[in-house]
Amino acid sequence: MEITSVLLKPLLTEKTTMLKDEAQQVAFMVHTQANKLEIKQAVEKAFDVKVEAVNVVRRAPLNRERQGRVVGRKPGWKKAYVTLRQGDKIEFFEGV
């Protein structure tokens, strides 16, 4: 998989902001076929930081219902929590 297509977008929520401050972690929405090694390489190349660990969470697809009938589906996606080396920062997340 191309390194440029691994990271889809950063996740900015209350939880990820707290993790950034307390545990030196940032979160990204990543391609569903990406593995931990590809995510690590993509973050290190894109932001010029060292990654210590990558934790991955998959969100299952959900059925959209209206009045008891299935109308459609929300697609599943994959989230990666990336732990950075002590002292490294990603400038994109610093103003949040």
Swiss-Prot record:
Q: Which InterPro entries match?
A: Nucleotide-bd_a/b_plait_sf, Ribosomal_uL23-like, Ribosomal_uL23/eL15/eS24_sf
Which GO biological process categories is it annotated with? translation
Matching SUPFAM superfamilies: Ribosomal proteins S24e, L23 and L15e (SSF54189)
**Per its record, what are the GO molecular function terms?**
rRNA binding; structural constituent of ribosome
Q: What does this protein do?
A: One of the early assembly proteins it binds 23S rRNA. One of the proteins that surrounds the polypeptide exit tunnel on the outside of the ribosome. Forms the main docking site for trigger factor binding to the ribosome.
**NCBIfam families, per the entry:** PRK05738.1-3, PRK05738.2-4
State what protein this is by name: Large ribosomal subunit protein uL23
| Native source organism of the sequence | Desulfovibrio desulfuricans (strain ATCC 27774 / DSM 6949 / MB)
Q: Which gene encodes it?
A: rplW
